């Protein structure tokens, strides 16, 4: 069995913050410098749609603080209504974040546009983005089954609304906020459960509590001055490296400068609660975001993961596939509930986990909103093909198990990891001793 040791300073920049930094830059007056922007396919899709709408974007590699190259992005804009009509459908590729959040900006522009994507994205539900935008005065049309292509007929006459999110969704919250920036009046967004709060932090919106509900108030039609952004390392990417270290006994890995925003780091709380040897060091605040270093040691057994709290599920949603695979291989047990949202991601992640774990000998039981693993009948005698379903997180989760546990796994699609973690496989190889 392999052992992994080393210091990780080349984790991908945070995907969520990179998306938002670029989108906010397109709405700000002046030149925005974004340091350590993500080079992943999804974030490049966001830059691509901005350029297609006439926003100048410049990218270059520059030396980073740890001696490795980082991506510097400069975006120029004149403010809220700087976009121009695109000459062709806006290609979001595999990025649901691009499609959903950019829709909020397009709703406030005085032209019609169409958002399209790859085969996987064209299957994902988009009806939840249409309702608030239509209420604000934009036109939105979807396919007959509520998926992309998304056609937005924007308007400079949007009006503010009070909107209660039907589910915890940072993307829908963000698109309503971006549309609200273009609207007359104050848009109020009510959250039943907290979701990642980068948009509020980056826009300087202070949440309120009214009648025990979290409310975000978005003042409309205020010009924003450009300001620089520094992107920390992506905690969702860190989860794969943390899991690698926990699965491989004797490993010791230090991961530097990771975003530890409380709405993103729930996976660490889950692991520490289960007895995993994970320590947070050098915690500090940079650009309004909590960041720090994560030390992971493969030194002791952990308890099976039981994840059921709706709030915890909501803020650990992207890490759940890796946590499920980790718990299955470490303890042959896993329990997940209240996670129906996983079925609407790049793939039906509950189905993808169950199918592939069963191929590897685990006993699984699916529910509409959950998954349980209750044991393992034995390791397969030969190689097992893991079906990735065009989903980067499914691919990387099982790649970690293969590398750390010596499982004979072949991925149906290795390249899909590049959606969020371009150097994933090279980093695993570099850490192996």
From Swiss-Prot:
UniProt record, GO biological process: amino acid biosynthetic process; aromatic amino acid family biosynthetic process; chorismate biosynthetic process
Keyword field contains Transcription regulation: no
Keyword set includes Transferase: yes
Binding residues for 3-phosphoshikimate: 15-16, 20, 169, 171, 195, 318, 345
GO molecular function, one term: 3-phosphoshikimate 1-carboxyvinyltransferase activity
Keywords: Amino-acid biosynthesis, Aromatic amino acid biosynthesis, Cytoplasm, Transferase
GO terms for cellular component: cytoplasm
Family (UniProt): Belongs to the EPSP synthase family.
The protein, known as: 3-phosphoshikimate 1-carboxyvinyltransferase
Organism: Chlorobium luteolum (strain DSM 273 / BCRC 81028 / 2530) (Pelodictyon luteolum)
């Amino acid at each position: 069995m392999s052992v992994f040791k080393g210091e990780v300073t080349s984790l991908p920049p945070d995907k969520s913050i990179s998306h938002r930094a670029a989108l906010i830059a397109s709405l700000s007056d002046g030149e925005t410098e974004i340091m350590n922007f993500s080079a992943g396919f999804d974030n490049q899709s966001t830059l691509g749609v901005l350029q297609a709408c006439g926003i100048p974007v410049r990218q270059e590699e520059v030396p980073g603080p740890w001696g490795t190259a980082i991506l510097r992005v400069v975006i120029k804009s004149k403010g809220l209504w700087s976009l121009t009509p695109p000459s062709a459908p806006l290609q979001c590729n595999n990025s649901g974040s691009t499609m959903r959040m950019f829709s909020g900006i397009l709703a406030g522009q005085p032209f019609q546009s169409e958002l399209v994507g790859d085969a996987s994205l064209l299957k994902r539900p988009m009806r939840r983005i249409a309702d608030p935008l239509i209420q604000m005065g934009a036109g939105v049309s979807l396919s007959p089954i509520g998926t992309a292509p998304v056609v937005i007929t924007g308007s400079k006459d949007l009006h503010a609304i009070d909107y209660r999110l039907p589910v915890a969704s940072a993307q829908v919250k963000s698109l309503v906020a971006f549309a609200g920036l273009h609207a007359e009046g104050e848009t109020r967004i009510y959250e039943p459960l907290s979701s990642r709060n980068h948009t509020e932090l980056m826009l300087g919106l202070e949440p309120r509590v009214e009648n025990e509900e979290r409310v975000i108030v978005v003042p409309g039609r205020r010009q924003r001055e450009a300001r620089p952004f520094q992107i920390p390392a992506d905690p969702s990417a860190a989860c794969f490296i943390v899991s690698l270290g926990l699965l491989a006994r004797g490993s010791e890995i230090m991961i530097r400068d990771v975003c530890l925003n409380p709405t993103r780091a729930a996976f660490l709380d889950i692991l520490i609660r289960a007895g995993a040897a994970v320590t947070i060091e050098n915690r500090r605040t940079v650009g309004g975001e909590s960041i720090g270093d994560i030390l992971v040691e493969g030194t002791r057994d952990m308890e099976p993961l039981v994840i059921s709290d709706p709030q915890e599920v909501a803020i650990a949603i992207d890490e759940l596939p890796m946590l499920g695979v980790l718990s299955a291989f470490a303890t042959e047990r896993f329990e997940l509930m209240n996670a129906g949202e996983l079925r609407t991601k790049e793939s039906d992640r509950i189905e993808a986990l169950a199918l592939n774990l069963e191929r590897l000998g685990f006993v699984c039981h699916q529910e509409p909103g959950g998954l349980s693993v209750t044991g393992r009948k034995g390791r397969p005698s030969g190689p097992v093909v893991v079906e990735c379903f065009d989903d980067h997180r499914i691919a990387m989760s099982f790649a970690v198990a293969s590398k750390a546990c010596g499982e004979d796994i072949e991925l149906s699609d290795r390249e899909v990891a590049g959606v969020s973690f371009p150097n994933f496989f090279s980093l695993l190889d570099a850490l192996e001793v």
